[in-house]
Amino acid sequence: CSSDLKNRYFKSHDMEVLRAPLPVGDYIIATDKVADVIRRKSDRKMELKKMDFLGTYDVSVDTKKDMQEIAGNICGRAHPRFRDECILAQNNGIKLYVLIENTDKVYSVNDVFTWHNPRVDRYNNIAYMHTLGKLLNVSLPKTKPTSGKVLAKAMLTMQLKYGVEFVFCRPEDAGAKVIELLGGSENGGE
């Protein structure tokens, strides 16, 4: 699991990971402001809520486990929630990096244009078999899977419109990449 790889990286570099709900992203640097929120809520024996952290950080990394997850976030049912998170970041001055882990040799948004979504092949095979009167017990998804070209165009639009930045890496490099994007050691990363 990719979160296991990240956690191993953090542990091997003596980084403590505190679990808390965040309004934007999955990872932030625990600044003095963040620590103050945690301390005050703990002193009052209150549960931390996402919005408690608004105004306490200005860089966040949201991680995606693969290309399918980001395709669903941008071009699928999860789009409204993902878009709202991007707008929330923009409205609160938070630089949001979306780190997409993948083994598809995608290293930039430009690479996404030529990314081949394996779900397209399955969709096309089922559609073809249906024309032959076969596999009729296998239903065809209502919408065709997202192509790399459509996904890349949507990413570029979101970058321009909301200031979100899409970054790519292999799963085994994700831990180091998260720290790099958060600002590394000069921001308390290492």
Predicted regions and their residues:
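Short, solvent-exposed amphipathic alpha-helical segments in soluble enzyme
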Residues: 10-12
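Extended, alpha-helix-rich binding/interface surfaces that flank or overlap catalytic cores
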Residues: 16-21, 28-190
